From Swiss-Prot:
Pfam families: SUI1. PROSITE patterns: SUI1. Disulfide bonds: none annotated. Keywords: Acetylation, Cytoplasm, Initiation factor, Phosphoprotein, Protein biosynthesis. Belongs to the SUI1 family. The modification Phosphoserine is found at residues 2, 9. One of its GO terms (biological process) is translational initiation. It comes from Homo sapiens. This is Eukaryotic translation initiation factor 1. The gene is EIF1.
Amino acid sequence: MSAIQNLHSFDPFADASKGDDLLPAGTEDYIHIRIQQRNGRKTLTTVQGIADDYDKKKLVKAFKKKFACNGTVIEHPEYGEVIQLQGDQRKNICQFLVEIGLAKDDQLKVHGF
């Protein structure tokens, strides 16, 4: 008869947690860009998921200057600090974040109509 060599239990997810430290910081986190309807034709664009390493107030200042819109940083109970901009700035924000190297194109998730 053949002897069974491997009698140890196997955890299929054990190796998945070992490789996490090899990834650069922020590669698995997504930046969510959403649009919300206000009254009439007015809209708000929200940006959520930017790492805490970056100063969000300075980012808002750059967004406001580049896109000629108003914006602020709000504290959301579920998502933490969220950037809020007036108008539909989804494409502009995507281009800007990739341009300055803050995020890669596959890290950006754009939501909305």
